[in-house]
A protein has these predicted regions:
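Surface-exposed, flexible loop/turn segments at secondary-structure boundaries
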Residues: 14, 82-85, 190, 196-198
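Alpha-helical hydrophobic/aromatic positions enriched in membrane-embedded helices and signal peptides
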Residues: 2-4, 44, 127, 160
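Short beta-strand-to-loop acidic/aromatic patch adjacent to the donor-nucleotide binding site
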Residues: 3-14
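C-terminal catalytic/acceptor-binding lobe
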Residues: 143-198
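Conserved catalytic core of nucleotide-sugar-dependent glycosyltransferases
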Residues: 16-154
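Active-site-proximal beta-strand/loop segments in catalytic clefts of secreted hydrolases
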Residues: 9-11, 79-82, 187
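Short, Asp-centered acidic motifs that coordinate Mg2+ and/or phosphate
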Residues: 5, 74-76, 182
């Protein structure tokens, strides 16, 4: 099935179309797109090219062509949502072994209070799959082995600490290992329907 992007949405996510377009805008940042004018020769009523005073064909602007630099696209782009406690978000950063152990085996999640103050997209090590856009080429990358969402054992350097991570965490680990950045835009918050919409 040919596609440009896949949008992964959990069934408990609350959003409007503006949030979708914001996600697409983040995946294609301004610096990834250049615009070139398209000109055509001016023709008379007989269909012949009209020449200017300098003897060269007259031209007119007929459109604009946008060119995407695929190296500047963001292959994995996410918004965020609050989890059930209303304070923790769906994006996180990995911790070093000692910090992971002292944090009770939990990643360093962005908190609602902190992420709300951010103004620009930033990279994360993990995103929940409730609201994430994935570019064609990520799943197809040779280092992204199927099944893409298989739980796996995350082992820290010393071997003394291990964590059985879930399917979305394992996908993020594999994506980063394959060289993909995971981006989050703090301005793209979607609702998360639990006992209430948070």
């Amino acid at each position: 099935l040919p596609y440009d992007y896949q949008l992964w949405i959990d069934s408990d996510i609350v959003f409007n179309t503006e949030k979708f377009w914001q996600l697409l805008d983040m995946a294609l940042p301004e610096e990834a797109v250049t615009t070139e004018p398209i000109y055509e020769d001016v023709k008379d009523e007989k269909g012949e090219v009209v020449l200017g005073d300098d003897g060269k064909p007259k031209t007119k602007l007929t459109g604009l062509k946008q060119i995407v630099d695929t190296e500047k696209e963001r292959p994995i782009s996410a918004g965020w949502y609050a989890t059930e406690d209303g304070r923790t978000t769906s994006v996180a950063h990995w911790l070093e072994e000692d910090d992971f152990r002292s944090n009770g085996g939990v990643m360093n999640h962005e908190m609602v209070e902190g992420i709300s103050k951010r103004k620009k997209p930033f990279t994360v090590d993990y995103t929940g799959f409730g609201w994430v856009l994935i570019k064609n080429g990520v799943f197809e990358h040779p280092e992204m082995k199927y099944p893409w969402f298989a739980p796996k054992m995350q082992e820290f350097e010393s071997g003394a600490v291990q964590d059985m991570c879930g399917e979305d965490v394992s996908f993020c680990l594999d994506a980063i290992e394959a060289g993909f950045d995971i981006w989050c835009d703090p301005r793209i918050r979607v609702g998360h329907e639990k006992t209430r919409v948070i």
